[in-house]
Amino acid sequence: NGKVIKCDLVVSATGVIPNGDTIKIDDLILDSDNAITVNDQMETNLKHVYAAGDVASCSRWKHAPLWFQMRLWTQARQFGSYAAQCVHTAWLDNGNSKDLDFCFELFTHATKFFGFKVILQVRRKD
């Protein structure tokens, strides 16, 4: 659109490639990019088997309109924290499930590079 945005540093980050195909568990369902598919409780298609981080795919979730998976370390950390909460909720065995955390409502990535604060906020084009 011709708009110029001044900045001190530009970092191009595209995430990582999942390698779920290295995990040799019979009947474990992988996505087309070799990520382990998980439900909204981070559980795979195998009962009591969970996956989180870059190897997990949430492609079958009903996403909030401003969130998508980009496989950056901040999302991996959020997945890990949320997966631990889901495992604990399942361990309680009270019939409840864990509600999706707010971090799955809006995709943002905040970090520091070379002493600069970096905020990445992306809108995906479908």
Locations of regions flagged by a protein language model:
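Mid-to-C-terminal Rossmann-like scaffold of FAD/NAD(P)H-dependent oxidoreductases
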Residues: 55-126
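FAD-site-proximal beta/loop scaffold in flavoenzymes
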Residues: 3-82
